[in-house]
Amino acid sequence: MKNKMWKLLGAALLLMPLAACEQNEAQITAQGEQAELVTAYLDAVDERYAYEIAETLAYDPAYLSNELGFRTAGSDAEHAAARYIADEMEEIGLEVEQVPVTVDRWQFNDASLRLEGTDIDIMPASYATNGTDEDGITAELVDVGSGGAADYAGKDVEGKIVLAGVDQWNEAWIDQYLHEAELHGAAAIITYDTGGYATYSDEMINMQDVCAEDVMPCVSISASQYRQLAEAIEAGNDMATLIVDNEMQEEQGTSYNVVGRLKGRSDEQQIIVSGHYDVYFNGFQDDSCAVGLVLAMAKGMVDSGYQPENDILFIAHGAEEWGASGTQFDWTTGAWEMINNAHPEWAGKTIAMINFELPAFYDGMSQGQISCVPEFSTLTKTFVETSGLLAEPVDAIYPEGISAESVDTNTMEDGVSYRASGVPYFINIPGTQEGEKGWIQQRYHTVADDRDTYSAQVMQTNLNTFGALAIYLDQTPALALDLNATCDDLQEALDTTLAGENAQPYLDALDALRNAAQAHQEEIAAINAQYQDALDEKADQQTLDEIRERGRALNVKTLDAFRFVQEQFIGIISTSDIVIKHVAYQNNVDVIEGVIAALEEGVLSNEEGSGALDLAWMINGGAEYGYYSFSTETNAASLATLQEESNPGNLFWGTDKGSVLAQTYPATVSLLEKAESEDGDFTEEIAVYAKEQAQQERYLQEMIRQETDAMQELTQMLGA
């Protein structure tokens, strides 16, 4: 998992969930055949088994690459872990396959940093970049402060090792620090966190995906280790030897997605239950606990004697954290390869994916949450409020129960790759609180993601909740994927003022689509109601099978429509914000208008945050912010890996999701310079912004027209 914000409890509360749930005493209120199936599963599922799997994956040295941990894309440790997971799946009784997919291989074996004249000997953590030879790099260590362009002024770093403080939460991702060091001729870069991540303590080393070309060794140390180095440099001991034993092989690695199949009565459809098993450090929560949960759910179903209607595939994906060099879309590579190259046919037959990330820590939330694509929000509400299949959270760990209001998914886990190919999905949510006291900023991708964070109650609650959800999905013949939610998103996304004369055709097409979506939803509901009536009347198996066959036929249309929605309407701003495609242009037009208005008033910055430089950073989804601290060359290098024009065939799940960026950066850079010189003439900058705003308006109108045409086509698809 890449980056999301969650809240952590204090240490005392964290200790409470360590005790295992003595027995799963979960109860449900529903009656009937589905209820009996869920009850049998709840009686059989074993939280302790999930913990044992997670602990083994996180701490057994046989499945780790070095003393810091690490199990990365295509590494020996990842291969060993795949075999272990496959063996466990076979022991459970699943049909097992290790599916090979191509990734960039990265194996981090070891690293050391020594300073001459001192006893400093540090083991840094390496990013997914090239290493050194066995002798390493011996060079002067130069402190470049916060690692921005201005920090290199007056410093000769040619052929030297630079030391930079980074904040990847608030300021910039590691690729910009890396490219800035490359621009100035450094031989390697050592980073430490000054804020954002790794706030648990100054002893924490943080690791992230690199989102860049492999240009030089890049490693991370802790803030306390930095202070040792800074004191040594101040004392005149600045000659360092950095050795990084990394094995990097672009497009020559193999990662294994381990699949355990629980065969259904029909193999025409399937459900996927998944987590990923590659890790930074020990990765206890992220994502060893998820693999434990996936296997425990499988074992619970098998042990309960559950016979699914559809195949249920339990999958441990590799190469989620990182799997490809030279792209901003370098995570969830194993999953992307799976659904696009290894098994593209899954896109038309997978009725749902249930993915897991960090599923066993207590976040302090009063209410548990389920995240899903918007089209599953109605199903989630029904499952929580009226199905009677949902057990209460274990030991009231979430005192207000599970929320019926779902949360939209994001791009930070394997579901994004499957969604882009037309697979709708769910994912657990540990919580959504933000801030430096939150779990993500404190422990995420550090050694503090450890077993001390384990909550048996949360693990058991997730096993109960999502196991019941999987059975509910499996037992329901017509997939209740509600395209009314698509219509809601399309309506909410449109600024009718900016859309101008294209607004009414868009809204007319949307009205027609909403009518078709509602009719489709009613057809789904009718089949499911007929099936429930047949169950209540104890109908024979032939009657039930005939209804299920009608449901499967309708599901084909439903999944085709969902895939069409992903292809035609869903865009991604930068790599993080999932939006309706025209919103990228709409936002730019709006922001640039504000920048121009501020410049016409002569205001660069003010307390209200409405000055030109207070706003300009938001252009292109925040990509413009890079110019505030880094050189134009560094920003160009980062953006080159983001866009299809400059990086064709290497955007993975970002393919066809981006937009044409506004070329406003010359004006923004000029404003930053004038802010220092107090030059108040902004005529040239206004001209640049106005030109780019007009271009973004043209792109906006064209995209709105395309979406209007697509709505009409989707209406016809649903009516066929």
Regions found by a protein language model. Give the residues of each.
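C-terminal motif of bacterial Sec signal peptides marking the signal peptidase cleavage site
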Residues: 17-20
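Noncatalytic luminal/extracellular "stalk/propeptide" segments of secretory-pathway proteins
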Residues: 48, 52-55, 59-161, 168
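Extracellular/luminal Protease-associated
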Residues: 125-217, 401-404
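Active-site-adjacent substrate-binding region
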Residues: 359-488, 567
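C-terminal non-catalytic alpha-helical accessory regions
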Residues: 464, 474-720
